[in-house]
């Protein structure tokens, strides 16, 4: 089973063991992706999740992991988990993405995030999706903006990477914003006064 949007060059699908091989051969390193390197990966962790079925999200779940596929091959993954604000269980879906080095800079990340946002609003009851990235990661900030998310601000000192605490840029889209953009046009981008700049 796959999920995509009309005209998108990427699709989202469940993991296979072959996908694990691709991702294991392309781990994040300080040289390949300093914004995604948080230490050495646990060998076989993803394989165990795939074999147990844990890596396959069930419909409506506010946590999950899917493969990003382009041109018939695994080029990375997207993941999401619940983020609650307050004591009432009304989760936000906080998501992230990881692409293998050869897939970066081709627009696949933007497309995958567009498809994931649509998937989450179509298959879960979340009222908000959000993502954050290091304030130095200008490429991902632009990708999130192109995917239709709004920059809401900076979360100071929230992210530990490269031996220090770093600020994170927070992006989000609410269900009403999503529905308004979808009604206007599938290509509509909602904008604010914020932009991804240094």
Where are these regions (language model features)?
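Active-site acidic-Proline motif in GNAT/NAT acetyltransferases
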Residues: 97-102, 106, 122, 135-136
């Amino acid at each position: 089973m796959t999920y995509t949007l009309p005209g998108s060059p990427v699709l989202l699908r469940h993991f296979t063991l072959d996908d694990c091989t691709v991702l294991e051969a392309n781990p994040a390193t300080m040289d390949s992706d300093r914004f995604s390197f948080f230490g050495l990966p646990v060998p076989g962790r993803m394989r165990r999740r795939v074999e147990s079925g844990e890596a396959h999200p069930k419909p409506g779940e506010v946590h999950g992991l899917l493969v990003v596929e382009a041109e018939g091959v695994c080029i990375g993954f997207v993941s999401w988990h619940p983020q609650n604000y307050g004591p009432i269980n009304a989760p936000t879906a906080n998501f992230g993405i990881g692409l293998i080095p050869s897939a970066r800079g081709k627009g696949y990340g933007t497309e995958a995030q567009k498809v994931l946002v649509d998937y989450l609003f179509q298959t879960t009851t979340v009222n908000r999706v959000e993502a954050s990235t290091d304030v130095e990661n200008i490429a991902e900030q632009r990708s999130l903006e192109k995917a239709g998310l709004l920059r809401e601000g900076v979360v100071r000192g929230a992210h530990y990477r490269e031996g220090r605490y770093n600020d994170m840029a927070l992006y989000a889209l609410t269900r009403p914003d999503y529905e308004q953009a979808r009604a206007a046009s599938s290509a509509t981008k909602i904008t604010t006064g914020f932009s991804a700049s240094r």
